[in-house]
Each structure stands twice: as structure tokens, then as C-alpha cells.
Amino acid sequence: MIDAWAIKRALCIFILINCVLKLGRSRKITWKPKKGVYIPLDDANGCKGEWKRKGVFFNIQSGKKGKRLKGRKGLRRGLVTRGTPQFRRDKFIPLFLLQDCEHRSLNGKQYNLRGRRCSSPLDVNPRGWDILPPEQPNEETIGERIGERIGEAEQLEDEGLDGGPPPGMEAKKSSSSSSSNNVHSNCSDAGKAPVCSQENIRNFCILAHIDSGKSTLADRFLELTKTIKKKKMQDQFLDMMSLEREKGITIKLKAVRMNYKNYIFNLIDTPGHFDFYHEVKRSLSVCEGAILLIDGTKGIQSQTLNIFMELQKHNLKIIPVINKIDLNICRLEKIENDLLNKFHFMKKDILHISAKYSHGVESLFQRIVSEIPSPAIKSNSFFRAIVFDSFYDQYKGVILIIKVLNGVLTKKTEVFFIQSEKTYIIQEVGYLTPEMKPTESIRQGDIAYVSSNIRKCDEVQMSETIISRDIVHLNAQRRLVVDSDLLRRNPSGEEHINVKRCNIDSSLGGVAPRMERIEREVNLEEIAASKVDVSYPVVFCNIYSVNDKQANELQAALNKLKLNDASFSFKPDVCETLGKGFKCGFNGLLHLNIIQERIKREYDVETIVTAPSVNYLIRVKEKCIDKQLKERLIDASFDIANINVEGGDHDDCNDNGGSNSDDRSDRSGKNPPDGLYYMTSNVNDIPQKNYIHGIYEPYVRTSIMTPEEYQKYIMAECFQRRGIFIKKESMDSHIIFYFDMPLSEILINFLDQIKSCTKGYGSMSYENFITYRESDLHKINIYVNNRSIDSLSFLAHKLNYQEKGKRIVLKLKEMIKPHQFLVVIQAGIGTRIFASERINPLRKNVTAKCYGGDITRRRKLLEKQSAGKKKMFSIGKVKLPPNMFTKLFDLKAQ
């Protein structure tokens, strides 16, 4: 009798085996050969399929010598041909190595993949090897290649089987990629030692107003020159910082080296926001030309005017380009007329492009090659370079971004820093492509990076000049000399040194020093490079760590940020309420916001930022100076002759008033009144009225561009903020207003008001040139429960100090939570209070248990509670929120 359970058991086993077999036919097989598993090709004659690994061919299917590879279970005849195998780096070979085999296409390249189910194309390129030469090698060539590599079969396991493409493939890849990049044969790859002539180097930057398409154009440069592979390409590729991608703006300048035909392009992408204008200035100092990009939908804007003036000051070649011509709202003819009338360009010089769709970018390449000059070449000269940017690397220390002015620099070379008077050994040199790619040497005209294992951030200064160490040394008196007998003082009292000549015609592409002396003497000023333009901070505030234990971490973070941002400055400061902190200087509120966010993200330090302020000039009465104030004046002493000072408040704030001259020289050279001056941004350092003659606040020349229909709103807003009208200019349907505005008035919310008045069509920018004007300013103190909060004190003009004080008090009332005691918030000038608000205390219902009886019992409980509240009012501490200053003073990124 047949057992039913046995039948069921056999049926289940049959189904299970069938499923396993189906799974085996459809599964992806990743076969990794090991020692003893494969058979060299010459030992398996007549096999139907071969694989190549590091120049050695192996069979993976059975041949005449064995139906199964030794020691490898499961690799029976035909098993690998089933299903859709997953091919790894060592799993494919070019088609011409195996004749009469089925194949599939891989990105335009054909590879052998013998089997019945090999009709669908591969969707990924495991290695990215390029097409091998079309001509097929004969059998003798293949046999010789196999014979040369057959001895490496036993070493494959030790060398690792995933370690890169075979040598033959590698060579073919490099040759193919060089041809695909359209690079001339005498120009090397960006990561290798340069062999291009210096006449073929083009150093240029892209400049424009905010949101004009600078980063998009930089993407097209990277894409069309094939500097970045297509699969790695993404929008705004050079904006690598997370903050840049979140906010959609460029914060830091980015240098990148590209190859175009037989030319080398050193491109610098710059920010557009005025708070990062110092990045633009540093870029112009190391370039020979610039692309002036104009938004085709908005035309010339206020920042465009400042950029054009800066380009003229540096005497750089300008290529005007109108972007976004693919949009229907592009005003091409109008913008062309504005460029012709305002900037006096020729119509044939103006290019029309669409950076998004690469239209016209190739023509821009030709203009760069033909119009932007190559760097100045000084043959037979020692190495000299200037530092224009730097950043800190965890493993390599301080990385310096330099421009080589003359000479050649190689690794392991000893160099001398002129400003810091220190010597370092170069550990690594290379190019930014945009990643750091080491090379053997860099030469004059190149924009490159160097690493010397510098661990202290304060040892490197912006505009530092680096020269060869073998031409100078320090004697016992710490003086710069070449040899002990070469430094001498001539009758005129000037110091000179002699330098060695260098032969740049070395066959190895390097520099061989020659020992003869040059006849003329080189002055020290000639060796030091001209300084890179650096903007000085205009906004100041104090930064404290929320946790006092992180004060040292905050200092280390600020040191590294200063290394990467030359316009940022800081010095230690101590506050009674907030502890140890730092007084920091910024170029604007957006700059402040970015620095605070970078401290939090990159260094994991929570910070408290105080109210922003500007530098005020104080004229003190010498007879009324006490000892404490005198000590403070000594620390803050400076040369008043270098400050442009104008006396008295100006009443010419109307359409007809003010000067009609825009010449900067008219605003300089004013002689300040005699007296003792000092400068401070800390309101608490300003003494009382009876100790000073006056307070001078900074004014800046501000340009505002607006459509004609909104000009009355712009005028009203500027006069409300105490602006002094200078002049106005007409440009087609737009008007440009020039005002001298108090710096403290335009920092907070002024741009927002301009955008609001003009429905988003207005733009604003201001110059760095500052004039100090005497103003009737009052120090406003903020009191919380009769205690002055020094970090909340600020200066306000007599016209609007009451309005500002009341607004601060009302905001504090909204931000401070109720306490167990009464909280009184007041604003006053000295002892005179002009604004006050109260936050009632939290109260417990102490009379809830009284259901009847005499009223005295109820009154007694209330009086006891009131007495406790009064006691807490005198000894209690009010808790202020840590983000109070940001909300209180509207520290929004302009």
C-alpha cells in the first residue's frame, strides 16, 4: 500500500528541487576566481569562453581538459551562461579577443558575454574602460601577450583581484580619454606635471550680480572641457559647502583648472552677494581677465556697477556676456543698449549665451583664448608666489592656494615666507581640478595649492609671499640676506640683497640654480608681491559659547574660519553675564549668519551672538579722562590722520541738497578737529556725555537702482533712515540713486524695505569707503528688574531713539517667559526711563482652600504670597533665551 505521506513528501521534495533549479538559472552569479580554481588559457585548449585578468586569460567553462574547474563546486558546464550574470571588474573582456561569440553592448563598446540570455544591454559600466583600438590584433600578438603574462597566474591572489584594470586597458584608457578631452598633445592632464607653455595659460574669473548664473556657467565649463565626468556632474558643482546648496548662493571663491585644446584655463567662481565682496577682490588680484555676466531678465543692477568699477581699477580685460537668452522675458536689446551707453562696450564685443543649455559657451571659449592675456612671464628668475586663499585639512594641515608669479616649485623644496619670516619644506604641490590632484612641479602662471604640514593657523597670513629658501637666509640680527656678505647698507640707507639666477630651460622641466650673481641689486620691496585686496570688517558683535567648557573649542573653530576667510577677524573678550567670548568683525549680517552656522555645523559648538554694532569714533575731553578710560584709550590708539572725518549733522537731506560730485577724492583728506580720539564698536566703552566732545558714526556711499515708478518710495525710505542725497542718474527706464547712508541704518532690514518698496525690482549696494560724520547719538540702556543688561545696550539717533527703545522693550516682553516673580523691562538714557513693560508673575491660588469664615484669613494668605513675590523680585534671576539677540535685532540675512 502506497503511503500517502511518502507521496506528499516526495512531491514536496520534487517541487523544492525544481524551484532551486529555476532559481539557479535566474540568479546573478558573482564568480571570483581563487588560486587553484582557474586554468590558464594555454592549458585549456578548445574552451568556448575565456576571461582576462591583469593580462592573463582564464577559462571559466569546461574544455577538453576537464569538465569542471579544480576545487570549485557548482561551476559545471554551461552554468555561467544561465540567467543574467552580474559582471564585476574582472568579468568581461573585449569582443575581439574572442571570435564567434555572442555579445552585448556596453556604452557603445562590445564585450563577450557568451550565453543564450545575453540580449539585453548592460545598464552600468563596471569599470568605465574606453573602446579599444578598432583594428583587431592577430593571433601572434595575442599569443605573445598571453606568454608574457602567463607567469603572473600564481601571484593573482597575493596581489588582489579587484585592484584595477589590466595594464593594457589602463594605457588604452589614458590614450582614449586624452583624445576625447580634445587636449593638445603638448598639454598634459591637470593632475600631472604641466608641460604647456606659459603663453597658453588663461587665468580669469566670473563676476556678476546675485542669481545671474555664475555657478551654472561654471558647470558648463566643467562639462564641455570634460574636467568632470558626466555621471558625477550635478548642478552648482563648485558649491560644495552644504550651506551653499541650502541657501542657493555661493559663499567661497572656488578655483579649478581645466584643459581646453592646447590651453589651460584657471577659472575662479566668485560669490555675488555684497557681504562676500572680499572674495571678488581677492580673485581679481590673481587674474588677467574677467567675464562680466549680466542677467538677461534683469539687466544691469547696482552690484554690476561696483564690479565694473573694480575691474577698471585692476585694469583687467573684460568680456561682457548676457546670460539667460533662452527665457521669453529676456530683454536683449535693452540690455545691449545699456551696456553700450553706460559701460561703453562695442556691440560686437557682447556675447549672448544660455549657460543652462550650453548655447554660445563654445564662442565664449574662443573669446577667452583670443582676448584674455597670458600671465606675465619672467624668465631666469627664482621661485616666487603669492597666497590668496587657504583652508585647513585634518591630515595635511594648512593648505595654501597660491599663484606662481615666477620660477618653478617642486616637492621637498625649502621655501621662505617673507611676512612671517619662517621656513618650511613643501610636502605636496598640485592643482585643483576641483579636487586636489598632486603633481611633481608647478611653474609660473599656475594657480595651484601647496602643503607644508603647517599646523598653526596663525602662521599664515593673506598676501603672504613665498620665495625659494636657497636665495635667502636669516642672520643673527634676523635680517633677510642671501649670504652673510651680501646684505649691506648703501649711503641712502636702503637695504638690498642679491639673488641667484635660475635657468628655466632645463631639459627636465625644472629649474637649475646658477651660482653667478646678477649685476643689479634686488630691493626687498621688489621681492615681496603686491598685496591681495582684503576687505575690512564693518559689522561687529560678540560671540560666546552656550557651554563655558567649549570656549577653547570655539577659539580653535574661529582660528580655522579666519584661515579660510580673510575678512573675518576676532579677539578675546570677557563678559560678566556670558563669560569668555570673542569680539568678531564681519562684512555684513549675512556674513555673520554664515559664520555662526558654520561654527555649529562644522565644529559642533552652540553659540550666543550679541547685538551687531559698527565702529564709532569718539572725541574725548582730555581734562575729563579718568585713569580707567586712559588705559582703554592707550589700547585703542590709532592714527586719526588716516580717518576721513566730517563734522556736524547734515540737514541737507532733501532732493535739492547734498553734493553733486561722486568723486571719491572729494570725500577724502578732511582734517578732523583737534583733540583725543579713539574708536570702538562696544557701546559700553563710550563714556558719559560730560566726558566727550562728540560721537562720529560711519557713513557709506550707497547706490540704489529702481524702476522710475518707485522712486518716491525709495527717497522716502532713505530720508527716514537719515540718508544724505548725493545725485541720481537715469538709465533707460531705471534710476540710480546715490546716498550717503549711516552704516548702522542700512545693515538691518534696509534691503528688505527696498525690495518691498519696488516689488522686488530694486537692488542696493554700498562701497567700502567710509566717512565719519558727527551725529547726535544717545546710548540706550536696557534694564531687566533694575539691572542693566550691557549686551543689550545700543546707540540711537535723537530722531528715533524712543521708537527703537520701545520696540526693543516690546520684543523682550514677548520673548521672556513668565517667572514666579514680577519682571520689569525698561529702556532709558542714563537714569531717565522712557519705555517700560511688565510681565506679571505666575501665581498659585492660595485661597482655594478657604470656603468661608472671616475675610482676614483670606487677606493673610494673599499678603504672605505678595511678600514672597517681592523677596523673589529682589534676589531672583531672569532667564533670557539664548537666541534672543537674533530675534531682537532682526538679524536676518540680507
Swiss-Prot record:
InterPro entries: EF-4 (IPR006297), EFG_II (IPR041095), EFG_III/V (IPR035647), EFG_V-like (IPR000640), LepA_C_sf (IPR038363), LepA_CTD (IPR013842), LepA_IV (IPR035654), P-loop_NTPase (IPR027417). Its main location: mitochondrion. It is an enzyme of class 3 (hydrolase). It is found in: Mitochondrion inner membrane. One of its GO terms (molecular function) is GTPase activity. Belongs to the TRAFAC class translation factor GTPase superfamily. Classic translation factor GTPase family. LepA subfamily. This protein may be expected to contain an N-terminal transit peptide but none has been predicted. This is Translation factor GUF1 homolog, mitochondrial. The lineage of its organism: Eukaryota, Sar, Alveolata, Apicomplexa, Aconoidasida.
